[in-house]
Amino acid sequence: QDMRTALLDLYRELDAYQDARPALDAVYKAGLPAAVLSNGNQQMLNHAFAAAGLTDRLDSLLSVEDVGVFKPDPRVYQLGCDRYQVRAEEILFVSSNGWDAAAAGLFGFKTIWENRAGMPVERLPSHPDFIAPSLDFISEHLSTGSASTRS
């Protein structure tokens, strides 16, 4: 139990990648809402994003706790539509997990797979709309209005 608690405490204190803040700043400056949609619980999300200093750029921290199932269940992705009262195709979903981007794409979101490690595209029933090596892609895309890394 002590090891589990120690690991969870470390997870709550993870530093954000250096490109996270500039990407969220770009979204904010563009007048767009930004949210996190996570399999984590609400308490963990609140603590982790406060510790990373990013909550001032996030409109919502959405947890699967609200629906009682985990991604890739479509009810989880529906949380984003319900929160912002938009259609799925109006949401741009960014994930560092290929399976998560694939499931979000099947749900109807436009997707970016943030693939820092340069992993090969997995054989999944859907592929991301964009593949980017970092979150800098978001800042660049919002400032130029074009995408340079098409999948």
Kindly label every feature range from the protein language model.
Residues 2-36, 46, 74:
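Short, acidic loop-to-helix structural element flanking the phosphoryl-transfer center
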